[in-house]
Amino acid sequence: MERTLQSVVGRRRGSSNRGRGKNSLISTPSYALHPPPRFRYPRWEFVRQTEYSMTACVRKGKLVLTYQYAIWKRVWTIETGFTDPSLFMTPAGTHTTEEIGHLDLFWLRYCSCPHEMPPWLDFLRGTLNLRISCRRALQASVLTSTPRHSLQRLAALQLCTNACLCWYPLGRINDTTPLWLNFSSGKEPTIQQLSGHP
């Protein structure tokens, strides 16, 4: 049976844009043309649509948290109302937040201790020490009750992980001070240290 396709070249399998004119309406999306840049994000933040990074800075004397999802341009900022951020730095370099808009509702809901409801402001100021078992229960309840990769889980987890740590004052903090501080050396930690690699 002779072939019905009468072209000199033979049957064209799907060649990518080569033999056709470049004026087709649907073009290859630009992100598919070039290989994605490597090491654009820290190695613990693989680019998924749901992953965010959090930084903190001081604006007009108040601590401002900034959340940015890895592949979106949009940045969320949450003003905490703190005037002295050194109170809210832990040795690990993480931040706790007192009033993050409506997120403190989640905080109030999930900080229930098995024995009693801890006064949450004391908890935040670091004057209240939860027992370790309570803190583990607290973390577990946060993980089961909040959606993954959400700001509310982030805030609640940070609040409950910072519970039993002691607070170190950092000295004077102004707009240029980096808030990821390594407490042993006083410098910013490397990405390896931040991501938990030795």
Curated annotation (Swiss-Prot):
Stored Pfam families? Lenti_VIF_2
Database matches in InterPro entries: Lenti_VIF_2 (IPR009979)
Where in this protein does the record put region Disordered? Answer: 1-31
Task: Check the UniProt entry and state the signal peptide residues, or none.
Answer: none
What are the alphabetically sorted keywords of the record? Answer: Host cytoplasm, Virion
Q: Where is the composition biased (Basic residues)?
A: 10-21
Q: Does the keyword Membrane apply?
A: no
- Entry function: Determines virus infectivity.
* Protein known as: Virion infectivity factor
Q: Which organism is it from?
A: Bovine immunodeficiency virus (strain R29) (BIV)
Q: What is the lineage of its organism?
A: Viruses, Riboviria, Pararnavirae, Artverviricota, Revtraviricetes
